[in-house]
Swiss-Prot record:
One annotated GO molecular function: rRNA binding
Organism of provenance: Carica papaya
UniProt GO cellular component terms: chloroplast; mitochondrial large ribosomal subunit
InterPro entries according to UniProt: NA-bd_OB-fold, Rib_uL2_dom2, Ribosomal_uL2, Ribosomal_uL2_bac/org-type, Ribosomal_uL2_C, Ribosomal_uL2_CS, Ribosomal_uL2_dom3, Ribosomal_uL2_RNA-bd_dom
Family: Belongs to the universal ribosomal protein uL2 family.
Gene name tied to this protein: rpl2-A
Pfam families: Ribosomal_L2 (PF00181), Ribosomal_L2_C (PF03947)
Any single GO BP term: mitochondrial translation
Entry annotated with the keyword Transmembrane helix: no
PROSITE patterns reported for this sequence: RIBOSOMAL_L2
Summary of subunit composition and partner proteins: Part of the 50S ribosomal subunit.
Protein name: Large ribosomal subunit protein uL2cz/uL2cy
Principal location: plastid
Amino acid sequence: MAIHLYKTSTPSTRNRAVDSQVKSNPRNNLIYGQHRCGKGRNARGIITARHRGGGHKRLYRKIDFRRNEKDIYGRIVTIEYDPNRNAYICLIHYGDGEKRYILHPRGAIIGDTIVSGTEVPIKMGNALPLTDMPLGTAIHNIEITLGKGGQLARAAGAVAKLIAKEGKSATLKLPSGEVRLISKNCSATVGQVGNVGVNQKSLGRAGSKCWLGKRPVVRGVVMNPVDHPHGGGEGRAPIGRKKPATPWGYPALGRRSRKRNKYSDNLILRRRSK
C-alpha cells in the first residue's frame, strides 16, 4: 500500500494519510444503489448498534465470492477502493468476456492472471477446493456451505491456514484464532487479503471518521447515572462497581455473547482467542 502524506498546512492534513495507488470509479454494470436506513436501529427504531450514523452515500459493488468461472483465466485490470469494506477489490476480465470484481489478494498487481477450478496451480488469487490444497496453505474467502460463496476471512489482511485433512472435513485455523472443521469440498482462495496496513492508517481528523458513518464514542464515566451505570458522582469519580458494566448493566469484560447450543458448536475444535 503506497501511503501519500500531505504537506503540513493544517493540523488535520498534517496527520492524514491516504493510499495514492487505488482508483475509485467502478463499472456501471457492477454497481447498484442501496437504501441505507436505520443506521444502527432495529425495526422499532431503537439503537441496537451504537456509534453508527451519517456517512457518505455508497454504491454497492457486486463482489464475486463464489468464483464460479471455472477453468477460465482472467486478468487483473484495476485495483479499486470499495466504501463497503476495508479490503480493496480488483476488476477481472475473463477470457470469455465476463467482467467481475473479487477481493484483492495481497501482492497481486495489474496484469496478473488468476483462475478457479479443481486442478489449478496453487498460486496467489486462484480459487480451488480445500481437498486439492496442500497442508499449510494460506487462504481467504472460505466457503462454509458448498456453493454459497466465501464467508470467512474476507476483511483486509485476513488469512486462514489449512492445518489438517481427515475424512470428509478439513481443519482450518481462522484469523480470530478459532480452529474449526469445514467440508473438504468447499472452495477457498489462495493467499491473504490485501490492504494489510489499514489499521495503521491515520484519518487525521474527526470529519474523516464521520464520512465513514462512525459517530463519536463517549465514555460511560462522564455520563449521567440515567444514561450509564458508570455515570454520576462529584467530579472525576470511580465507576462505583466491582466490575465494569455495559450501558444496559451487563458485565462488560469476559462475558460470552455466543448463543448456547448453536448448531456449529460440534464443528469448533477451539474457541477464538480474545
